[in-house]
Amino acid sequence: MTNTRKTHPLIKIINHSFIDLPTPSNISAWWNFGSLLGLCLVIQILTGLFLAMHYTSDTMTAFSSITHICRDVNYGWLIRYMHANGASMFFICLFLHVGRGLYYGSYTYFETWNIGVILLFVVMATAFMGYVLPWGQMSFWGATVITNLLSAIPYIGTTLVEWIWGGFSVDKATLTRFFAFHFVLPFIIAALVMVHLLFLHETGSNNPSGLISDSDKIPFHPYYTIKDILGVLLLIMALMILVLFSPDLLGDPDNYTPANPLSTPPHIKPEWYFLFAYAILRSIPNKLGGVLALVFSILILTLFPLLHVSKQRSMMFRPLSQCMFWFLVADLLTLTWIGGQPVEHPFITIGQLASILYFTIILLMLPIVSLIENKLLKW
């Protein structure tokens, strides 16, 4: 008798992706983040759907509707904080997932990597638009500052900004369209995830050694389904500790003040996961230059396959590259810290140095160090 799992047109797709998928036998816990990102996306879509049932995208009632969700809707506070902190967990997993890709040379899967970078951009856009929806002070001023960056584009900039706003300032039209986009983009993300997986399964997974592992593959189920469940439990535990004990830990107190176009908050800053890019943006005195640096700080990820000059794929056996990688991580943490600080004397200089270092490590130091390691192989 034929196995339905292997013959049914629909079930066999799931089978080839999650059950009988040949997987390297030595992949570590760093490979758990793909499935955790899938879980985060499901959590965000579900909690977001229930929030959308009670939210109103009108400037007069948006803030009140959030209050209504937290006070009057059954477990509304839980859904709201799971959604807000779920975004933070999403970005933690994203950064670790990208970091894993950089460390182990997964970027040599060109299509998978580039779709991953597109996914990162779309997730960042979605998170930004979601932050505008509660219509607090930081929502309003964050939307004003970030959308205003597009006015730096020569010739069409101002027209483009007013077109996005739907008027001459961030107002009702802006909020309504941001809600529409924020609702639809996660489904586009889900579609892109399918393409991401499609390309990944063409080549198979990378592994910590960076070597071809065709001779030593094991089925995904039960080995990695069990392993993923551990990650799932840890993620849910971390999320629920955050939600139930300190739900506002990562938020901004300014967002509990309703949006007021007449008073600017003392320090306009985005959510923590955008601070590194925000620091790079602020460190350049020129508006257009800052915007280009901001975009390039993420877009630079697409250059990694081209900048890979090492004879080895993974950094597992490359101690000098490992040092450079951890310098880069430390630099990103420094940028994140600077992004949350006011624009004052020591922070401006630190931000500028950290921004220069970020691009120098990626474009110059990593390739040079890789070439040195290639030479050392011959000794």
From Swiss-Prot:
A ubiquinone binds at residue 201. InterPro entries: Cyt_b/b6_C (IPR005798), Cyt_b/b6_C_sf (IPR036150), Cyt_b/b6_N (IPR005797), Cytb/b6-like_sf (IPR027387), Cytochrome_b (IPR030689), Cytochrome_b_C_euk/bac (IPR048260), Cytochrome_b_N_euk/bac (IPR048259), Di-haem_cyt_TM (IPR016174). It comes from the Eukaryota. One of its GO terms (cellular component) is mitochondrial inner membrane. The keyword Transport applies. Its cofactor is heme b. Heme b b562 binds at residues 83, 182. It is found in: Mitochondrion inner membrane. GO terms for biological process: mitochondrial electron transport, ubiquinol to cytochrome c. Heme b b566 binds at residues 97, 196. The chain crosses the membrane at residues 33-53, 77-98, 113-133, 178-198, 226-246, 288-308, 320-340, 347-367. It is a multi-pass membrane protein. GO terms for molecular function: metal ion binding; ubiquinol-cytochrome-c reductase activity. Keywords: Electron transport, Heme, Iron, Membrane, Metal-binding, Mitochondrion, Mitochondrion inner membrane, Respiratory chain, Transmembrane, Transmembrane helix, Transport, Ubiquinone. Binds 2 heme b groups non-covalently. Component of the ubiquinol-cytochrome c reductase complex (complex III or cytochrome b-c1 complex) that is part of the mitochondrial respiratory chain. The b-c1 complex mediates electron transfer from ubiquinol to cytochrome c. Contributes to the generation of a proton gradient across the mitochondrial membrane that is then used for ATP synthesis. PANTHER family: CYTOCHROME B. Heme 1 (or BL or b562) is low-potential and absorbs at about 562 nm, and heme 2 (or BH or b566) is high-potential and absorbs at about 566 nm. The cytochrome bc1 complex contains 11 subunits: 3 respiratory subunits (MT-CYB, CYC1 and UQCRFS1), 2 core proteins (UQCRC1 and UQCRC2) and 6 low-molecular weight proteins (UQCRH/QCR6, UQCRB/QCR7, UQCRQ/QCR8, UQCR10/QCR9, UQCR11/QCR10 and a cleavage product of UQCRFS1). This cytochrome bc1 complex then forms a dimer. Belongs to the cytochrome b family. This is Cytochrome b. The gene is MT-CYB.
